[in-house]
Amino acid sequence: MRTPELTRRRMISGTGLVAAASLTGLASRAIGQTAELKPSVPPPPIGRAERLARVAKAQRLMRANGIGAILIEPGASLDYFTGVQWWRSERLTAAVIPATGEPIMITPFFERPSVAESLGIPAEIRTWNEDEEPLKLVADFLRERRLTRLPVGMEETNRFFIPDRLKQQLAGARIVSANPIVRGCRMIKTAAEIALMQAASDITIAAFRHAWPQVRAGMSASDIDAMIGAATRALGGGYDGGLVLVGEATAYPHGSKKPHVVERGSNVLFDCGCSVHGYQSDISRSFVWGADATPEQRRVWEQVAAGQKIAMVAARVGRPAGSVDDAVRAAYTRWGYGPGYKLPGLSHRTGHGIGMEIHEPINLVHGETTRLAPGMCFSNEPGIYLPGKFGIRLEDCFHMTAAGPRWFSTPPASIDLPV
């Protein structure tokens, strides 16, 4: 459940980037021990040939759906298709991929060298100056390619000014969802993508194994997150912060603003991941520190572990994604939780899509009718939360194959051996 809205998560949980001086001495010493960790050798990054195949697939899907072109703003999809890693601002940089022919990049004149440096596919770069309208370049391109009578696809995260100003430049322009195109490509991971996600998962598990035995009484969530982050970076993963919850905060999926420190019998939750060449991991582990788990803690932990297994049995190619969530929730209801999303119980979806982004379509959630297919990747995190007491979340990701789901990380054996 490692949420991509990093600032929001830190605001809620009270966990943030912390200076070394603000860490406890125990945490600082533990971070110093990461020197013994050696970075792994990752698989190669996504190359030109794979990106060209992605563009070709997108074009086939556009033609099948009667779409003339798609406009891709900065973000994971722009990186996915072009290799350009950029940011969103009032100055438009975007790719326009037509249903046939070579794509173009639109960018400010002064940004051209930087865009050209990272562009990973053949594409003409068209520039605009500060006193010019960038959407005119898009309109002109559509006219040149004789695509003005076909709709233009845009992602649902595109900002309003883009379609609005395109319509001003191209009378009668029709804007439709690019979901059938972009999701049709990004939801199905290739072997190269799965290898990068496997590498990211391996790093996160190794970081957990390094950090778990070094948790000490008096440590804060920020202390523990800093330990995990230092280990992750030492092992070669990109890390921009995780979610660590302690005590009663574990009863709330994204934590609480109340400060908590580790003490004997504390319920502790790690929810962290990393990136390898742009691909993500997302893993959660729950355990009791410094004491044997109570019968209630052990029972809930084992029920969540059973929930993960139920999800894996339900995840079969051709079944609706929502059926996985339904299977877990039905079992939890039989065990006295819920019903549905009510508490105590499972108040969030069973899982989310994952790839270049921590959260991607589609989700393992009630009502999702998209059929599971080989290459789809998901988290499996059917946590159980007891408000005012504690919560248990175990999270491991998996990818679909024709023979069934396959784990990226192996679930833990018990609450006593959580990593």
Walk through the language-model features, giving the residues of each.
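Active-site neighborhoods and metal-handling regions in enzymes and metal-associated proteins
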Residues: R2-L6, R10-V419
